[in-house]
């Protein structure tokens, strides 16, 4: 579906063959996030920022508001048995039950972290799409916050550097300012849900800060 959409400077490798346990797709020349941002120029970083702006602005231009409360409640119920924060789960459930959670309905990548982008000087290649329990660009913003603000992939892959941290902080600040009007209760609910969804993968004190913030 994504490959049929038009986003400025964003592409996805063409998939040729899909089997049960694997798929074949075009080879894409580019760099992972650590390679790219370790040597990125100011212009390279601005290119990434502007390309993300174009992506989200395009999604917003066709958005329509929908009530996502039932889908969120269903997801909350699926997390009950897996969490070490049962009281927080109950708090979230009651909050969603008492308040309609309205989100802008759009396409979303489903797992838009920088680990799922191949970086090129004049292109970003999105890979590893996932189904999203709530189809909204807010879900993509939440995943970017996971990477840019909480430094999830950087710490997970043990490639932290002050340079990358500063670049990520800059990119997230830009996104936060541009989409400030969407950083509302719906965004914060989805953000909290994302932290609970990745809780089983939080294996260190450094990673657990995602749940505590």
Regions found by a protein language model. Give the residues of each.
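A glycine-centered beta->alpha junction motif in the catalytic cores
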Residues: 21-42, 189-211
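Acidic carboxylate-rich catalytic motifs and surrounding loops in phosphoryl-/glycosyl-chemistry enzymes
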Residues: 66-70, 183-193
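Active-site acidic catalytic loop and adjacent metal/ATP-binding pocket
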Residues: 93-139
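Alpha-helix-centered segments that form part of catalytic cores
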Residues: 80-106, 166-184
């Amino acid at each position: 579906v994504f490959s049929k959409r038009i986003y400025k400077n964003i592409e996805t490798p063409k998939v040729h063959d899909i089997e049960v346990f694997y798929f074949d797709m075009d080879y894409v020349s580019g760099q992972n996030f650590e390679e790219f941002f370790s040597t990125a120029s100011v212009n390279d970083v601005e290119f990434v920022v502007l390309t993300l702006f174009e992506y989200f602005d395009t999604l917003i231009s066709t958005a329509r508001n929908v009530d996502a409360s039932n889908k969120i409640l269903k997801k909350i119920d699926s997390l009950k048995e897996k969490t070490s924060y049962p009281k927080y789960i109950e708090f979230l459930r009651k909050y969603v039950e008492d308040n309609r959670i309205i989100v802008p309905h759009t396409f979303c990548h489903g797992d838009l972290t920088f680990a799922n982008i191949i970086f090129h000087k004049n292109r970003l290649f999105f890979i590893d799409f996932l189904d999203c329990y709530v189809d909204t660009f807010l879900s993509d913003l939440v995943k970017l916050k996971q990477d840019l603000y909480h430094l999830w992939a950087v710490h997970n892959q043990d490639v932290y550097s002050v340079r990358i941290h500063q670049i990520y902080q800059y990119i997230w600040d830009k996104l936060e300012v541009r989409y400030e009007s969407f950083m509302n209760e719906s965004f914060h609910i989805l953000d909290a849900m994302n932290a609970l969804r990745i809780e089983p993968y939080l294996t260190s004190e450094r990673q657990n800060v995602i749940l505590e913030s």
